[in-house]
């Protein structure tokens, strides 16, 4: 492709609203442009990268036995109402009405549509297992779109769905697609980890996320320093043991703590360590209010609270709800005196506290010498806190460290969550009606492009891995007015294309500095510069990833490039 014919508008300045490298560079290099908040156009170079990621996804999915189809973006509300997600999914679901006032959603995901499709066609175990996938635009009304393609309102996604007669069949296909995902992200050149995850609104049981390691990632990965254990911090269980001290229990006492609300303030004011304080929080669990206790130096993990109750929705109670429940402000909450049908659950660490402190449910006061079970009753002690760096790894090997990650893939064992809700059944080998067992497997295709750009860049621009680069080679005649340089550039361009390389020829009448700056910004794997030594049959070859350059004779160029790109 000749650069003079390409639509690739570059920017010299960093756009003001672009916070992270991938967003900045994809805009500056002319790979995409924003149409509205969280909505982007892919320009020609960006689209070439997107198509290469798509191709890798298709190859690995088909190798794993999945078959491609395409489902509609507009989905009837009746299907979501049938599954129970029309109201539970939340405000991220984009809803609309047609001219006849019939309700629809723009697809955020396609479990309902695929289940409806398959239940009408698959009636016997003899047609199972079946794995179908699509690459389709998805829509989510993000409250705060940010980071370019990493959190948009419209994005390209590969979603696959598998259907089974037995759990063993699901396990087999799940493992196969897990490996396919690992292959996809490895082929894209990414540094990633597969981690244990929470299924969230999708439902189901076993689930893993594929996380690209990056400091700008919105998720925290907890991993062992000596083993392969890795989990989203939401899902990492705490296996610590707590020993109760043998100090004598002292008399409960209420003390004034004016304007002291945060644990750090209270512990400093009372000269009590944070690990002897009891942090009290009120959660709304499927409309039921629950008091949750953790140690002062720990944080409540709301996903674990949700899992204790098997709840659909867990959120912090509002200030108004807390005031009505306990007649106090949030900063003065405590478990003592909580009565009626309000349940108190606590993290294991709370049980070991002796002579601790807690809020007194009265503004400006706290209790000291608080002892669980003597001063208040707990209905259940369980794991309710976030794991911390330095904690023992849940697999018993090593200690936990943290890293940030960008989620690019997610695989779920859905089980019968959707098939039972939507009456998707088949006849088993004994002629009995059974619900279809399902799996679900998603990859953010456009998000993967951004994740690659986030991992592969330097101070001068993008540095694309060869598997996804828009072109393999960038040929730059420095002076297009020079017949020797122009003709040699054309000859190299044509000969490399004949060998199957994708080549970009910079045939613009621009200054050398502009051409080189754009070349660094585009980030193609190999740059061939045709300069003053063209008359001698010599060009300069530069490897973008390493910055290494070498003069090469034209007759040796193809072999030299082949060794770089092998």
UniProtKB/Swiss-Prot annotation:
Gene3D superfamilies: Anticodon-binding domain (3.40.50.800), Bira Bifunctional Protein, Domain 2 (3.30.930.10). It comes from the Bacteria. GO terms for molecular function: aminoacyl-tRNA deacylase activity; ATP binding; catalytic activity, acting on a protein; proline-tRNA ligase activity; transferase activity. It holds the Pfam family tRNA-synt_2b. It catalyses: tRNA(Pro) + L-proline + ATP = L-prolyl-tRNA(Pro) + AMP + diphosphate. Belongs to the class-II aminoacyl-tRNA synthetase family. ProS type 1 subfamily. The gene is proS. This is Proline--tRNA ligase. HAMAP family: Pro_tRNA_synth_type1 (MF_01569). Catalyzes the attachment of proline to tRNA(Pro) in a two-step reaction: proline is first activated by ATP to form Pro-AMP and then transferred to the acceptor end of tRNA(Pro). As ProRS can inadvertently accommodate and process non-cognate amino acids such as alanine and cysteine, to avoid such errors it has two additional distinct editing activities against alanine. One activity is designated as 'pretransfer' editing and involves the tRNA(Pro)-independent hydrolysis of activated Ala-AMP. PROSITE patterns: AA_TRNA_LIGASE_II. It is found in: Cytoplasm.
